[in-house]
Amino acid sequence: MVFAAFGYRRAIRLVTSFSVLALFNLAFAGQGQLLAETAIAEESTPITDPLENGASLGPVLHLPPNSVAQFKQQQPGANLPTAQVSQDDVSPTEPAELPSPESTASPPKDPNARLRIPPNFGEGFPIERVFIYVRNPSNDPKQEEESRRQLANSFGIRAGGNFSPLLADQGLNQVQRLPFVESAEYRLYQSNLPGVVIVALLVNLKPQEVSQVPGPKPPRGMVISGKLRDFPTLYESDRSLVKLILNGGVGVFSDTNPWFGNPENFAPSSYQPKGTITWGEFYLEPGLAGITGLGNSPVYIYGGASYTVSGTVQPDIFRTDSRFYGNIERLYGGFLVAKTGNPLVFNLSAGRQIFQLNQGFLFSQFSGSANALDRAASYSNPRTAYEMTVLSDLRWGYFRLQGFFLEPDELSVADSNTQYLGISAQYNNNQGVEAVLTYVGVPQSSRTYLLPDGERLTRQGLQVINPRLQLSPLFGVPGLWFQGEYAYQFNDRYSMSAQGGYLWLGYSVQNVRWQPSFSYRFAGFSGDNPKTATYERFDPLQASGLTDWLQGISLGKVYNNSNSFSHRVNFTVMPNSNFELSLDYYYRFADTLNNLGGNPALQTLKSYDLGHELLLIGRYYLSQNFLLQGVGSVAFPGTAIRLAADNNTSPWVTLQVSLFMFF
């Protein structure tokens, strides 16, 4: 039996025990450390002015499951990663000089990290660490310590939260108002861990003799200047910021032997594409977002709205017609209570917006909305916002308590009226240790689970316990990291006992050209044993993400994260500071031969072997606003898929080229 061969349940229990113990141990950890790491450069050139693109705002591009690549942090080469810089690491011969806002030159080297990503590209991703870098530190240790404390408290961005350009801009504005700050900017970097980002605040201090509180910052923006050079900022002052949103994408996609060359068995409709199918997709998302303070109080209100137009030109692998669709994408509002110097922060928002829990194992920001049928651009996946959300977030130092209500934006022909309620307790010490415990319930849903006798059980009443643990560095070894997560599912209306989880180990090689990184992940999701009275098939909920939980760009289209195990090996290199190449190998196999609830052709498996897939992703940042991405994949059907089609199958080849824009 597969469970016995691979020790799945034993591994899952280990993840559970490890995560829960970490939660209890860390809950009583002291809070003596600063909330953000700090480092001091020996010598540097002063910042002349914060970069314009270091203060981006609003809901923008979120690359879809079929095109977003896994985050991988560049490791030290000529420059060092944000979280590891110290005074001795910064060469005085390589000053961190920043160009003026009008500069068109390439971003200069800085002592924080190699690969910098646009703030809007990282929106919604978990923050692994927050780093504060003082370029011209004081010679007085006590004054320096106090400056760092005030910078961390004023910025307000904490490790463990989900990155928001809107709130990062608000925090930067607070930092720039400090009497000892000459100039400041924040930057966003990839992490060596998958699916998380690092935030760096870069600050230049005023001379010690200059300490007066600055006057109000003159308003700026297109409304004030009437000039296009201020795009996308409409209006910015000390307490307010309003920006235009303009996201978009265009791509060419080509599949050879879609549905493993046998659409009669595996395609979700009567359309049967054969041979090579090539088509184009596009989308455009204009909108508006802003934040403003209420008087001199610590209360801020914010919101955003956008409209997405998408299209598919020529037949794709789902339908024969060209189609175009437009609808509201984001429409949300909220308020933030954040008093400078107070570790207690509260944030409440509601409406159409994105949401991601942890690394997307149960809830991914790419699965909030369906992108099929009439909505067009299925591979580009431009729609990600949930139809309705209510999100609350309470933070105190290293601790975070999050509550959420979610209602996915499903297709009308397949609307299950599913609603999710959840609460999550998190500890993140900004030193590489994160422990999370989450509870999720489903108070409403018409979706059902199919049993061998034809009976159906409803998803309504489903409950999930979800612990998670992340360690970086592992055992104090630079570049070595670990992630583990587990989910136990039960239902208060009938006997259900399903489980899923993963163990993920990775290593980023230090001080080597191209900064290679390696990782291995074993993941498992239980299937239902028809001989027991308990229902055991795992429900993947809203998991997604091309290099996270789709588990194969082609295999994932015919087999989801239920009744399956997978081995995944990743190898990533970065030939230069703007270019990343990532190669993934997946091998997937089933837990049980009973697969009711899966693809109609795979309801009863004749083998545990599901298939293999190789996935190559290349990303090249043309600038802080444009990304060129290429994807290539070849999926080989396993014995179970071949036998379901009477051995009439072929490898499924996918090629994609996309250009994304985000302002």
Where are these regions (language model features)?
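Bacterial N-terminal signal peptides
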Residues: 15-27
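Beta-barrel outer-membrane channel/assembly domains of diderm bacteria
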Residues: 104, 214-348, 394, 467, ...
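N-terminal periplasmic/intermembrane-space "pro-region" immediately following the signal or transit peptide
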Residues: 3, 28-300, 518
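Structural signature of outer-membrane beta-barrel domains
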Residues: 191, 249-257, 306-312, 353-357, ...
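Extracellular/periplasmic loop regions
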Residues: 485-487, 495-574, 578-582, 589, ...
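N-terminal secretory signal peptides that target proteins for export/translocation
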Residues: 1-12
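Outer-membrane beta-barrel translocator domains and adjoining extracellular loop/strand segments
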Residues: 256-265, 312-319, 360-367, 406-420, ...
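Signature for the C-terminal beta-barrel architecture of outer-membrane proteins
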Residues: 228-231, 342-346, 371-532, 610-614
